[in-house]
From Swiss-Prot:
Organism of this sequence: Photorhabdus laumondii subsp. laumondii (strain DSM 15139 / CIP 105565 / TT01)
Cross-referenced PANTHER family: TRANSCRIPTIONAL REGULATOR SLYA (PTHR33164:SF64), TRANSCRIPTIONAL REGULATOR, MARR FAMILY (PTHR33164)
Disulfide bonds: none
InterPro entries (alphabetical): HTH_MarR-typ (IPR000835), MarR/SlyA-like (IPR039422), Tscrpt_reg_SlyA (IPR023071), WH-like_DNA-bd_sf (IPR036388), WH_DNA-bd_sf (IPR036390)
Organism ancestry: Bacteria, Pseudomonadati, Pseudomonadota, Gammaproteobacteria, Enterobacterales
Stretches assigned to the HTH marR-type domain: 2-135
Keyword terms of this UniProt record: Activator, Antibiotic biosynthesis, DNA-binding, Repressor, Transcription, Transcription regulation
Record feature DNA-binding region, as residue ranges: 49-72
Molecular-function annotations in GO: DNA binding; DNA-binding transcription factor activity
Protein's name according to its UniProt entry: Transcriptional regulator SlyA
Amino acid sequence: MESTLGSDLARLVRIWRALIDYRLKPLELTQTHWVTLYNISRLPQEQSQIQLAKAIGIEQPSLVRTLDQLEEKKLITRHTCANDRRAKRIKLTEDSASVIRELDGVIESTRNEILGGISREELAFLSTLVQKLEQNIIQLQSR
């Protein structure tokens, strides 16, 4: 019988993300918005869109729509890089700090609820397995 681990993991990510999106809906934000804001807030100031896309692990064109939405919500600003007119620098606005705190609170409480009833040891073991799977995949990709 064929293993369904890949499908199981994909489904888990899909329903986890759907729950986050549902819980962020009152804030008129999504999990994608949160991931983007989270990464912007943790990277050195005024990263380029290219650097941000690499940090998130997506292609730059995929990021542009999310950045457009965040700019419309006045959570970020973008301006042309002085050294390279093709590059755009991203900066969080003052308004974004309180929104990011609120987002982080929703994400953290949701994570705690999802992981309820799972021991620290079980989580550590799961994390080790996921890291091993990731290493195996990276090695296979480099062949």
